[in-house]
Regions:
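Alpha/beta-hydrolase superfamily serine-hydrolase fold, recognizing
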Residues: 1-183
Length: 183
């Protein structure tokens, strides 16, 4: 992406990653594991760092350190995604958990999650944001949206508008601190 983004008007020095649900999980994992060969087979020498991450309603702790914060996700993940159980291969589940990779080098994060999410419990975002704030040297913003459900931003609404506006403001601040002009 960094090698080609300039051809399309983008700035290779300011790449931001985002995603919702599984994309929230994967974007967080990618943001926290730049340059780790195990996560980028075939392009181990490529700079995969990002300037910021903005995950929406993601799963951040697959091993469920909070007890009950995965509410049935373990069965789905073991059958369809990881293809092994947590009991049989805890190390692999840890490696796939963004919270396991939180550290001082984490990029700025803006985590968004709804309180009424029935797919991914809000406790996932709370504990992830707390872990980031406790260890990262960069800004960490957490927006917990009252009564918002999973995928709250799919349909246009006032809530979606405000969430998008908040993300835009966050990225403008990160961009200005990153040394780039804000749009």
């Amino acid at each position: 992406t960094k090698a080609n983004i300039g051809r399309h008007g983008g700035d290779p020095g300011f790449l931001v990653i985002t995603g919702g649900s599984a994309g929230g999980h994967l974007s967080s994992l990618a943001a926290l594991t730049p340059g780790l060969a195990a996560y980028q087979p075939g392009f181990e020498d490529v700079d995969t760092s990002v300037a910021a991450a903005v995950p929406f309603y993601g799963v951040y702790d697959l091993v469920d350190r909070q007890r009950g914060a995965t509410r049935g996700l373990e069965e789905l993940l073991s059958k369809r995604v990881i293809k092994t159980t947590l009991v049989d291969d805890r190390a692999n589940w840890e490696l796939a958990s963004p919270i396991s990779h939180v550290g001082p080098g984490a990029p700025p994060f803006f985590v968004l999650h709804g309180t009424n999410d029935t797919v991914v419990p809000v406790e996932q975002a709370r504990s992830f944001s707390t872990a980031l704030r406790d260890t990262s040297r960069q800004p960490v913003v957490y927006a917990e949206l009252p009564r918002a459900q999973h995928a709250f931003d799919i349909l246009p609404s006032i809530r979606t508008h405000h969430a998008v506006h908040a993300v835009e403001r966050f990225l403008a601040v990160v961009r200005s601190r990153h040394g780039g002009a804000t749009p």
